[in-house]
Amino acid sequence: MSKTTLSLARNIKKYRRKSAMSQDKLSKRAGLTLHTIAKIESGATLDPRVETVKRIADALDCTIDELLVT
């Protein structure tokens, strides 16, 4: 798992928990499947599409940069 993938997974989980949001709620707000959110958070998706990361960032009220910071 790359450093970027690990940071993205860790930061999505951090922002989601900070917002007291379940993976299911995040998936609905982002218009993605629960499976997609779970795979990205676990690091199983090594290179998610920029559009997907943008939708997650918008749902979490943060920027893509905040999700990628190490």
Predicted regions and their residues:
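A short, Lys/Arg-rich alpha-helix, primarily the initiator
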Residues: 1-18
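Residues within the helices of the helix-turn-helix
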Residues: 13, 24, 54
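Short alpha-helical DNA-recognition segment
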Residues: 21-40
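DNA major-groove recognition helix of helix-turn-helix
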Residues: 41, 68
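DNA major-groove recognition helix of helix-turn-helix/homeodomain DNA-binding modules
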Residues: 51-66
